[in-house]
Amino acid sequence: MSIGTNTWVGYEPLYLARDLGLHEGLALRLVELGSTTQAMDALRVGSLDVAGLTLDETLTLLHEGVPISVVWVMNISAGADAVLAQADVPDLASLRGRRIGVEQTALGAYMLDAALRHAGLKAEDVTIVPLPVDEHVSAWSTGAVDALVTFDPPRQMLLDTGARTMFDSRQIPGQIVDVLVARRAALQCCAARIAQLIASQQQALAHLQAQPQDALQRMAPRLGLSPEGVAAALAGMELPDGAANQRLLAGANPPLAQTAGQLMQAMWQQGLLPRQPDLGQLIDDRFAHTSAEQTP
């Protein structure tokens, strides 16, 4: 079973599980992608069974008719997504007329819109520079942009070089959520493998809590950060365990469905969704029930 993610500290427990040997003997293949755009494309054509996406990207695919459901909440951003500015930009309002680099994703558009509205600005008040996330650091260092809508690990790298935080996901709490989604065909054929993937991720989280130094040392090279940088990045998010996932996903109208409904409405109003998708099959909560039963 193929599982695709971009490089994002909130997905790193999946790779930590592999590094700890928890995938040995299991038919699981992690596919490392350059961006969530690639993950979305792979889900569209069926070349991935499972992927890590933000909730807004999930809504975009559901709107397109891609047959996926959320099976797990990986992380909830609480500062790890941000708008950073160069030292000569004193505040958000000073971004008027400036160049802002942003990845061409629903999340990038959503974060940019939220930051601009917070500053009383509109998109036409700034120069938007489309910029894949793997070019964020180089564009910053060459002065090609005055500000960036970015996330870890680039966020942490840039903060270490003197970037200033103008706006981050703490100002829109609970709205930037990363989830594991599965194609419904995979849910039919491979539910046991999805359960194994989630169980190994939870074991990796337990290792992170019990032996943080070892876990951070293992995670740092893949992310291109120091262990201290990984710890700082993790401080900007919540990593829900099995019990938390049951609270978020299970039952009638669970919290994640409510968040998705609010996010869908905001995306529709901002023109990011031409129409509002049916959320009837947004969540498959079977794994949340199973994992919560196993949570100590």
Model-flagged regions — what are they?
Residues 16, 41, 45, 59, ...:
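Solvent-exposed, polar/charged alpha-helical surfaces in well-ordered, non-transmembrane soluble domains
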Residues 1-122, 128-130, 146-150, 174:
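Short, glycine-/small- and polar/acidic-enriched structural segments
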Residues 88-93, 117, 125, 137, ...:
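Proline/Glycine/Serine-rich low-complexity intrinsically disordered segments
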Residues 190-272:
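Secondary-structure end/capping motifs
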Residues 57, 129, 135-224:
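Pocket-lining segment of extracytoplasmic ligand-binding domains
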Residues 261-296:
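Conserved C-terminal helix/tail region of periplasmic/extracytoplasmic solute-binding proteins
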